[in-house]
């Protein structure tokens, strides 16, 4: 979901069914490169959760900007919360003048920076043939995949995948025009286990009497005015 879907009628969308099955999750475009933010991102991000959908956010990869600049721009613009899907990197093309090894290293740089922030493996979105040709290196094996593969009755990719985007010409009440439709590979319970978890509680027993105030992130008495 992005600006291309225009203004969403969320009252209609939250009651939408696909083959008698409710729509459970929505992925929203946030950023592209190191300077573009989708004009509908903030409203779509808010409304998705407000209307009861599990939500995810994707960054559209640009080959014109460094991986580090893109990763830090995404992290500055997007504040995911517990209960959201892990961040998504949408990567669909490789420069002709770049080696596959260099391209893969750039993608891994983005993934590692974002993973360090959220402590979850980002999702890689790409299409079937691109995955086979450019992202088959074993360094990507631990990342969850969201594969676009249209005009087939079932996913032909034989590796592990989490989400299948099976059409780019879906129709849903509340959305004008076409929208991509996706299927999660597992149960609703399985899908919930994939979401960003709540932070682990602090183990107070691990804090000794000698622990300094500074290490707890509060102001120590000696610095008080």
Spans of features found by a protein language model:
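Functionally critical loop-and-helix segments that line ligand-binding/catalytic clefts
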Residues: 1-5, 11, 136, 140-225
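Short beta-strand/turn micro-motifs composed of small residues
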Residues: 59, 126, 149
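Proline-rich low-complexity regions
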Residues: 86-87, 122, 148, 155
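Short, solvent-exposed loop/turn segments at secondary-structure junctions
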Residues: 95-97, 130-133
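Aromatic-lined carbohydrate-recognition surfaces of secreted/lumenal glycan-active proteins
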Residues: 119-132
């Amino acid at each position: 979901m992005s600006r291309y879907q225009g203004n969403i009628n969320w009252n209609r969308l939250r009651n939408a069914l696909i083959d008698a099955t409710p729509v459970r999750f929505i992925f929203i475009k946030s950023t592209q490169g190191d300077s573009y933010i989708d004009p509908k991102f903030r409203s779509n991000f808010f409304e998705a959760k407000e209307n009861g959908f599990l939500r995810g956010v994707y960054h559209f990869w640009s080959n014109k900007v460094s991986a580090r600049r893109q990763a830090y721009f995404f992290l500055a613009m997007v504040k995911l919360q517990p209960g959201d899907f892990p961040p998504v990197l949408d990567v669909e093309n490789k420069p002709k003048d770049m080696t596959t090894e260099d391209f893969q290293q750039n993608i891994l740089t983005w993934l590692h920076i974002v993973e360090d922030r959220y402590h979850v493996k980002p999702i890689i979105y790409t299409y079937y043939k691109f995955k086979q040709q450019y992202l088959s290196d074993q360094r990507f094996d631990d990342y969850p995949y969201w594969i676009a593969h249209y005009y087939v009755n079932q996913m032909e990719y034989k590796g592990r995948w989490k989400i299948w985007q099976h059409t780019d010409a879906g129709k849903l009440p509340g959305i004008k025009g076409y929208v991509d439709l996706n299927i999660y590979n597992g149960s609703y319970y399985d899908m919930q286990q994939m979401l960003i978890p709540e932070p682990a509680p602090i183990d107070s027993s691990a804090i000794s009497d000698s622990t300094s105030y500074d290490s707890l992130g509060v102001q120590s008495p000696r610095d008080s005015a």
